């Protein structure tokens, strides 16, 4: 085991240079981890990788995995099961390797093919939208991260969330679907409502409808959120939602 590994520093490889992957990789680098490589297929993802991670090599997926102690899977949720299974069939995963995915809807069961090869499965989803730029690194501070992991390694998932600037809370394997629905609802409905209201104002000739609505929307949303926020936990530890003590996995894809 290397001195860096003993000190808790990991070689991190990222699969997917979308808005989420590039930002989280940069956040882990900021916490002192070494970035071993990133996979990027499209022109946009290659440009993003070059902008956010200029000294990190763009490599084929198998090579990224081979180089890494922690593999960050930041791919669309619908691609995750086949990716994990295909890599397992190719013998890519190895014992003791940390495999982290960022899809809101999945817990760690989707990583079973990697786990059967001896890898350690973790699900970590930051509850925020991403631009894929350095602005997101600042926004990560204080963002809540949904974490799901087997009980013995749950502290690893929580620690990674904290290292990226976030506040971890634990979501049970069985509750990941409900969690994802909540995230989707918050994002889609808030966007639709603002678009509808702005369209009505623009229709009657109101200039800068977004600026007119901004104070009202922010205040309304803040008041609504306050009704559902009991404040910080007494012991300062990670929050746990209903069912999160499920023995299977107590406890997010480009969002």
How should these model regions be labeled?
Residues 8-11, 96, 142:
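Phosphate-coordination loops involved in phosphoryl transfer and adenosine-cofactor binding
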Residues 31, 48-52, 114, 135-225:
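Internal alpha-helical scaffold of NAD(P)-dependent oxidoreductase catalytic cores
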Residues 43, 47, 52, 57-135:
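Rossmann-like NAD(P)(H) cofactor-binding subdomain of soluble oxidoreductases
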Residues 202, 215-255:
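Interdomain hinge/lid region at the active-site interface
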């Amino acid at each position: 085991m290397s001195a860096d590994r003993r000190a808790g520093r990991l070689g991190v490889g990222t699969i997917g240079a979308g808005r989420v992957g590039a930002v989280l990789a940069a956040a882990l680098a900021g916490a002192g981890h070494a970035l071993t490589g990133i996979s990027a297929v499209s022109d946009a993802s290659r440009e993003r990788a070059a902008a956010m991670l200029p000294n990190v090599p763009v490599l084929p997926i198998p090579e990224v995995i081979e180089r890494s102690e922690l593999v960050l899977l930041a791919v669309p949720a619908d691609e995750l099961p086949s990716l994990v299974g295909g890599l397992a069939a190719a013998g890519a995963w190895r014992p003791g390797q940390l495999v982290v995915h960022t899809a809101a809807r999945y817990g760690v069961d989707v990583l079973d093919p990697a786990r059967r090869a001896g890898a350690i499965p973790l699900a970590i989803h930051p509850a925020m939208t991403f631009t894929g730029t350095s602005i997101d690194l600042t926004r990560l501070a204080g963002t809540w991260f949904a974490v799901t992991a087997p009980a013995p390694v749950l502290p690893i998932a929580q620690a990674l969330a904290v290292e990226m600037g976030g506040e971890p809370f634990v979501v049970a394997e069985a509750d990941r679907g409900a969690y994802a629905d909540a995230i989707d609802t918050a994002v889609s409905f808030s966007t639709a409502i603002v678009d509808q209201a702005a369209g009505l104002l623009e229709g009657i000739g109101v200039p800068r409808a977004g600026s007119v609505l901004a104070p009202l929307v922010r205040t309304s949303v803040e008041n609504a959120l306050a009704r559902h926020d009991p404040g910080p936990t007494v012991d300062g530890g990670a929050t746990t939602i209903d069912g999160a003590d499920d023995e299977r996995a107590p406890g997010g894809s480009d969002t």
